[in-house]
Structures are given as structure tokens and as C-alpha cells.
Amino acid sequence: MQRHMLKSKIHRAAVTHCELHYEGSCAIDEDLLEAANIVENERIDIWNINNGERFSTYAIKGERGSGMISLNGSAARRAQLGDLVIIAAFAMIDEQELKAGWKPDLVFVDEDNKIKGSRDHVPTQNWT
């Protein structure tokens, strides 16, 4: 059996550009793509923390070290400059990989979309 699992996440990145008339996609700083294990043309889901919008597009490379998160084409209508977003990618993982210890790549960024940390799991949520 295979399970549809979170593979990659860039958490709380700020939108730096909205390019309505650019060919659709989301341009992401190449440093962030590599850290999160997202490849060019991979399908990504984007969740806008500010307005609750959730949509899918695909990733393209943004300038390395720029902190770029550019929503292009129709995706540009889903956010404003400065909105915080979560960018996620999913993969089909088989039971053997899961039992062998497969983990996702989670990347956390600062206010300039520079990497401030990474993890391979989401901590258990507590009620305290």
C-alpha cells in the first residue's frame, strides 16, 4: 500500500512578488527549493495564512539567495505582497519506506525568507 504523505514544506514564507501576467507558477529561491527537496516543475500546494486561500501550482526556480516567493499567473490573485504562506509538496510513499524511517523535509524561514532552521517532523500538538 502507498500513502499520500507530506514530503516537503516551506513554513511561513513571505510573498515577495505577484506577477499576474507571467506564465503561471510560483518562483521560489533556489536555496529554499534545495533545502525543502522541491524540484522545478513539481506540483506544490500553497496555503495563505493571511486570508485562508489554498491553491495548487508548480514550482520554478527563483534567484538563489534572493528570498523570492513569486506567485505568477492566476496564483497572483490569491495573495498580496507580504502575505505569509506555507508551501507544501506531497508524495506517494510505500509502507516499506515508512517503516524504514522515511521523513519529510520541513524548512522554516525568517522575515526575509532566509532559512532559520529545518526539521524532519511536525511536533506533537499539546493543549497547554
UniProtKB/Swiss-Prot annotation:
Biological-process GO terms, alphabetical: alanine biosynthetic process; pantothenate biosynthetic process
Enzyme class: lyase
Catalytic activity, reaction form: L-aspartate + H(+) = beta-alanine + CO2
Location of the active site: 25, 58
Pfam families given in the database record: Asp_decarbox
Domain of life of the native organism: Bacteria
The record's account of how the chain is modified after translation: Is synthesized initially as an inactive proenzyme, which is activated by self-cleavage at a specific serine bond to produce a beta-subunit with a hydroxyl group at its C-terminus and an alpha-subunit with a pyruvoyl group at its N-terminus.
Subunit-structure text: Heterooctamer of four alpha and four beta subunits.
Stated role: Catalyzes the pyruvoyl-dependent decarboxylation of aspartate to produce beta-alanine.
The protein's name: Aspartate 1-decarboxylase
Organism, scientific name: Burkholderia pseudomallei (strain 668)
